[in-house]
C-alpha cells in the first residue's frame, strides 16, 4: 500500500489521513543538496532510528536501531560518506541525529539517493517528528509522533511512500 504525500501537507494511507510537514521549498522532481525541497517520487523505508531514552521502542517490521549521542548523517556532497550515517565528530559536514528539539526522537530512513549515492542529489531524506505547528522541514516529511508511530507499526516491506508533485 502506498503512503501518498501531496503538496497540501496531507498524507493518505488507505482510509487514513495524516497531516504532515514538507520541505520549505515544496516538492521537486530534481532534488539538490541544500534546496530545502522534498523529492517527488516513490521511496522505500529501510530502517528506524530512535531515542530510546525519550520514547518507547516502536513495534515494527523494519530494522530498528537505538540512536546514540555521537550519531550523525553526512551531508557533504564530496565526502566518501555522503548521505550515510556516521559517527561524530566526522571530518566532513554532518547533521547531528541526537537533538534537543525532539524532531529526531523517531526517524525513518528512506532509500532516497542511496543506490548509487549521487553527489549533490540530496541527503538525509527521512520521515521524522514534526515541529510545533508543522513548520517546514529541510526536505523531509514530518508527522505527529503518534501518527509516525502508527505508520512504523503497520508498515510492511511491500509498502511505499509516494510523494506527488503537482
Predicted regions and their residues:
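Cell wall/extracellular polymer interaction/catalysis modules
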Residues: 1-137, 148-166
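Short cysteine clusters
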Residues: 140
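A conserved hydrophobic position in a structured secondary element of the catalytic/binding core
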Residues: 143
